[in-house]
């Protein structure tokens, strides 16, 4: 099996797990946050910087790479790892979420999805087979199944038809993937916010005995309380001996809550996207560095942070860079936000190990401002 999880400890007061994710490109401590490198790059970061920040696995995007530069070119380069000079693990999402976000620009059939490229308006087609073949060409360690990402809100009938199609498509992905010695296919549980539909979806996809499972269709606009409720009844339906991945979640509160419900893996564009907007994550909540109050503040973003940015630069200097549209500003903010989250995950793992996760959550939430 190309990818497996070794569960080292289960928390006795929550559903949290401490583990090691074994992949063809290294062993990653879990729970883990995966930075997003949509177009074969985590925006503004070099692979060496990502390693220094503590990232062992990153996410890349099938939809974007399929459109540009094209998967055949990446195959020619020796795969995504060689192409982008990254020797850690890579998870590629299937492109399903991006295609379904196109709204009126796409047409869903049983065969797949016809859509217009956001780059040049040309007609394209993605199916379970094509999405899997593209990911085989990319050579990622973890291949996500091509699923129908159900929007929120969705009617019960739509959610049921959608999850059943996702199961049929998953079987087609499984039949297409011939590189199981070095690539692991993860199935995705759908079912919107309906408990019985989530149960149906989980039962159907776990029957296929895949190397890992993801919870999809969350973090799509629903209230966080509802997302936690769905996780409460969905995660226990997934096998304990397989990795569990919550797609598209990366805010500090949701990472902690997700871990407490038994999730091992997370990804989100949040830290990199808000960095480019001039917003930093800190222990005491979000800090909008571009705001006027940072103009004469010569302290670091977060004095407790060990990242390159906090060790060397002031809020005033960072604000100047951001206001002047200097690229260094985006880089330094991104370095900090990614380090903040890899550090958060490291603290979460330590808290699980030392049986103090609920206490850690309470202290973190209080300091961050979630409880005020």
Curated annotation (Swiss-Prot):
Keyword Transferase set for record: yes
Cofactor info, note text: Binds 1 zinc ion per subunit.
Binding sites annotated in the UniProt record for Zn(2+): 305, 307, 310, 336
Pfam families assigned: TGT
Listed GO CC annotations: cytosol
HAMAP family: Q_tRNA_Tgt
Names of the cofactor(s): Zn(2+)
InterPro entries reported in the protein's UniProt record: ArchSynthase1/Queuine_TRR, TGT, TGT-like_sf, tRNA_ribo_trans-like
GO biological process, one term: tRNA-guanine transglycosylation
Gene Ontology MF annotations: metal ion binding; tRNA-guanosine(34) queuine transglycosylase activity
Protein family according to the UniProt entry: Belongs to the queuine tRNA-ribosyltransferase family.
Known role: Catalyzes the base-exchange of a guanine (G) residue with the queuine precursor 7-aminomethyl-7-deazaguanine (PreQ1) at position 34 (anticodon wobble position) in tRNAs with GU(N) anticodons (tRNA-Asp, -Asn, -His and -Tyr). Catalysis occurs through a double-displacement mechanism. The nucleophile active site attacks the C1' of nucleotide 34 to detach the guanine base from the RNA, forming a covalent enzyme-RNA intermediate. The proton acceptor active site deprotonates the incoming PreQ1, allowing a nucleophilic attack on the C1' of the ribose to form the product.
RNA binding, as annotated region: 248-254, 272-276
Active site as annotated: 93 (proton acceptor), 267 (nucleophile)
The gene coding this protein: tgt
Subunit structure: Homodimer. Within each dimer, one monomer is responsible for RNA recognition and catalysis, while the other monomer binds to the replacement base PreQ1.
Catalytic activity, reaction form: 7-aminomethyl-7-carbaguanine + guanosine(34) in tRNA = 7-aminomethyl-7-carbaguanosine(34) in tRNA + guanine
Protein name: Queuine tRNA-ribosyltransferase
Keywords associated with the record: Glycosyltransferase, Metal-binding, Queuosine biosynthesis, Transferase, tRNA processing, Zinc
Binding site for substrate: 93-97, 147, 190, 217
First-tier enzyme category under EC: transferase
Pathway: tRNA modification; tRNA-queuosine biosynthesis
Record EC number: 2.4.2.29
């Amino acid at each position: 099996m190309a990818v497996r999880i070794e569960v080292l400890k289960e928390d006795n007061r929550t559903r949290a797990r401490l583990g090691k994710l074994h992949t063809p490109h290294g062993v990653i401590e879990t729970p883990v946050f995966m930075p997003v490198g949509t177009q074969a790059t985590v925006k503004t970061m070099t692979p060496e910087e990502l390693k220094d920040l503590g990232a062992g696995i990153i996410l890349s995007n099938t939809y974007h790479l399929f459109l540009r530069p094209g998967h055949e070119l990446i195959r020619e380069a020796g795969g995504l790892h060689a192409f982008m000079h990254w020797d850690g693990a890579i998870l590629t999402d299937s492109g399903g979420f991006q295609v379904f976000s196109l709204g009126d620009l796409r047409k869903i059939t049983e065969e797949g999805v016809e859509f217009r490229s956001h780059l040049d308006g040309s007609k394209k087609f993605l199916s379970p087979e094509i999405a899997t073949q593209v990911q085989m060409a990319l050579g990622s360690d973890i291949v996500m199944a091509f699923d129908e990402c159900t929007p929120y809100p969705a009617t019960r009938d739509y959610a049921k038809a959608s999850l059943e199609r996702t199961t049929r498509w998953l079987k087609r992905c499984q039949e297409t993937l011939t590189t199981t010695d070095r690539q692991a296919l993860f199935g995705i549980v759908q079912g919107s916010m309906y408990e019985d539909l989530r149960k149906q979806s989980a039962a159907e996809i776990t029957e296929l005995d895949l190397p890992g499972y993801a919870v999809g269709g969350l973090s799509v606009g629903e209230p966080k309380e509802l997302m936690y409720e769905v996780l409460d009844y969905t995660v226990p339906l997934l096998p304990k001996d397989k990795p569990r991945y919550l797609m598209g979640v990366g805010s500090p509160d949701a990472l902690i809550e997700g871990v407490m419900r038994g999730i091992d893996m997370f990804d989100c564009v949040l830290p990199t996207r808000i960095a480019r907007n001039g917003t930093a994550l800190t222990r005491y909540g979000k800090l909008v560095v571009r705001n006027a109050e940072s103009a004469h503040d010569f302290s670091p973003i977060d004095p407790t942070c060990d990242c390159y940015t906090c060790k060397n630069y002031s809020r005033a200097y960072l604000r100047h860079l951001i206001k002047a549209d200097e690229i260094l500003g985006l880089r330094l903010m991104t370095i900090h936000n990614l380090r903040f989250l890899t550090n958060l995950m490291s603290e979460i793992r330590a808290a699980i190990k030392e049986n103090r996760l609920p206490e850690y959550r309470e202290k973190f939430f209080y300091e961050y401002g979630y409880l005020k």
